[in-house]
Amino acid sequence: MAGGDSLCAMSADTPPARANPDDPADPQPTGGDRADETGSTEQPRETHKGPVTLRRGQVESTTTDQRLLDTRGPTDWVHADPWRVLRIQSEFVEGFGALAELGRAVSVFGSARISRDSAEYALGREVGRELVKAGYAVITGGGPGTMEAANRGACEANGVSVGLGIELPFEQGMNEWVDLGVNFRYFFARKTMFVKYAQGFIVLPGGFGTFDELFEALCLVQTRKVTSFPVVLVGTDYWGGLVDWLRSRVLAEGKIAEQDLSLFSLTDDPVEAVRIVREANETRRREVEEEATEAAAADSHRAERSGSPGAGRRRR
């Protein structure tokens, strides 16, 4: 600056000169410049975190890199929501990677609280065996009770037995009959895997967790988020009251449509449950093949009517 003046020596009436507005090294005043009681102009405190601008009281005293490299710093940042987004992403990546080559599978749900000598445990075990005989892998929540029974049946039938565990304060770890296990922190990531890698649900008697998985599947089918996804309830005595209530109260009051009650089937027979799933899958496979054939025929017909540019030139 001319005359050897400096910013510190300038009077309050003299604005700081901008030697080179295009030079990033030259500090530029902003619209947020403020004058204190002495008349000096100060820059507002401002930092950037990616697309986020922070000023004044929102400015952090340390940088992201500094906190990363300072091993003596606090560690509670790993529990902040932005970090959780990365953790959630990692759960989807791990789940997709582990299950991508699974092949045909069915998710089986039911209570974690039944004993191994109960009729429901035997029922779950038979469901697992029948699914393997029909060519399906068995996916469960990986826990005890019905989940263990279905995994055990699949394992004993020399099939693929999958467990998708969840971090809970009171649950046991992955049961011993799981051959391929993936653990999750977040329910929604885990439930995505149950639907994405299964060709249907078989639901045995269970509690709130079972109801959650059942009604999420029904909602996804009802809203066409998934198509041709068979849901089979096993245990007419257990599920009958719920089905009656859906018909006599929910349907009667117009809160669901008549066709919504056809989104699931009810049986006592594990063999029939697997047959329902298999037939629904075969029907859907034929529909997809027919749709592909019709689409190819329509494309061919349009091409014949319009003619290719090359064909037109040859005729001339």
Regions found by a protein language model. Give the residues of each.
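Generic secondary-structure signature for well-ordered alpha-helical cores
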Residues: E94, A98, Y136, C155-G159, ...
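Acidic/glycine-enriched connector segments
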Residues: G145-V203
